[in-house]
Amino acid sequence: MKRWTISQVPHLVHGRTNGETDPLTLFWTASGLEVNVRGGELWVELSADWSMYEPWYSFVVNGEFLSRRMAEKGTHRVCVFRGMNPETVKNVRIVKDTQAMSGDPESLLQICALETDGSFEPVEPRALKLEFIGDSITSGEGSIGAKAEEDWVSMFFCAENNYAVMTAQAVGADVRILSQSG
């Protein structure tokens, strides 16, 4: 297993960021990192903090939603996949599910590094780019969870079930989202 910083590997950054990749700070819904990995396993090192609203994130492998997690405070290694065919290339997206939490100035989610037993391949940028500006629906609020849920909590935000992300996928575009519940 070898550890790589984001700037050391071919990648695409999704969403508006501060322009830095070491670490890559994720602010907005559906912001994230996309890489192509030829290897049997991939781990991501994430750093997170918050006082009220914990960030949530998802892994998408080969275009399919794979898993979703709450970010733990501090810096942690998380397995994206393991035990897969080391000869095939896997397209991986690490995606922030929650919106920018203006009510929690400590809210933070950063991708610090990647670890794999393989190598990274170039990621082809999409020809189209869409940007959505909106409110709670655009932030993915309520796009996951039981229909009866009415609590306003981070775990009910989801980028994968979001109309902006679905629209971009339908037309083969990259997506940027600037939105805030209100």
Regions found by a protein language model. Give the residues of each.
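N-terminal secretory targeting modules
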Residues: M1-I133, I137-F156
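A short beta-strand-loop structural module common to alpha/beta enzyme folds
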Residues: A173-G182
